[in-house]
């Protein structure tokens, strides 16, 4: 990984409330990128505000007025048949939706915190194996510059891409505890923007470029670099395919060039290469109009 090897980026839109049939997406995006807007943006976008007290398991979010977990999870790489995820913490990511009241992970946040750089051999190995549980389940509030990561087996997918599909996983809990989570959509995309600095991988699912080591943020140079929405369900995915220039390969994967679609649910992608233009001690991609491949989930790798 790091700045010379850009991995695939996976987006999961995870629905916490299945009865409503509604997954949360990126909405009401604030494009006034003053420094005073950064924390407000992440808090508002990674969960939506609700004054009700009906969902007690989200009580850790109520101090911020956030009563839903963050739904967009960005996956960085595939290691030993496992997807490695990373994005921003804003309270919690999701919860174990098991109906078994005796389950060890009942109502436990489906995310783990790690401060290990994912392109360091030790940190990456510990994250994938997860024998020690890393820093434990997310059960508190976190700052803007924190990252989260969790892993779920690719082979655990039930197959298909319907909203009611389950992902069975032994992560982020330990090996002896299993959990499940619902997924609404799965998109395999090229990374939108990322760079490595001194062995610290930086994740960018918002169009914001964060340097965790230096504890600073660099704002995007163009607001249209922002990933402001995620595709929420099958009908929107179908609409996206119909409204974009697309071709299908022999494996029924659809390649879509998003720049010619009017749908506001689509991200703004980039072409990527190992030869990024240098910006200070960071690397960034400047070419735009990339091509995204949407892969159908499968039980086989």
Curated annotation (Swiss-Prot):
Belongs to the MgpC family. This is Putative MgpC-like protein MPN_093.
